[in-house]
Amino acid sequence: MANSKSAKKRALQSEKRRQHNASRRSMLRSYVKKVIAAINAGDHKAATEAFNAAQPIVDRMATKGLIHKNKAARQKSRLNTKIKALAA
């Protein structure tokens, strides 16, 4: 347990940030799951729309440091490849 005043403050800040990050991570996963669901359904139009909505969210979370920028790029690339395969 935190003993000093500054340690208590850091513990409170850490918990607040943990909850905020958990909320953002959940939102990110929800957007990606919508894209995957549309791909699995075989609906190219819905998958494209869901991807267009998810793309800025993924980028924003990478900018905020929630996920690594390479992970964001990899996620977007793999989803886009699957969407293009639907059109073919």
UniProtKB/Swiss-Prot annotation:
One of its GO terms (cellular component) is small ribosomal subunit. It comes from the Bacteria. Keywords: Ribonucleoprotein, Ribosomal protein, RNA-binding, rRNA-binding. SUPFAM superfamilies: Ribosomal protein S20. One of its GO terms (biological process) is translation. One of its GO terms (molecular function) is structural constituent of ribosome. Residues 1-27 are annotated as: Disordered. Pfam families: Ribosomal_S20p. The keyword RNA-binding applies. NCBIfam families: S20. PANTHER family: 30S RIBOSOMAL PROTEIN S20, SMALL RIBOSOMAL SUBUNIT PROTEIN BS20C. HAMAP family: Ribosomal_bS20. Belongs to the bacterial ribosomal protein bS20 family. Binds directly to 16S ribosomal RNA. This is Small ribosomal subunit protein bS20. It comes from Shewanella sediminis (strain HAW-EB3).
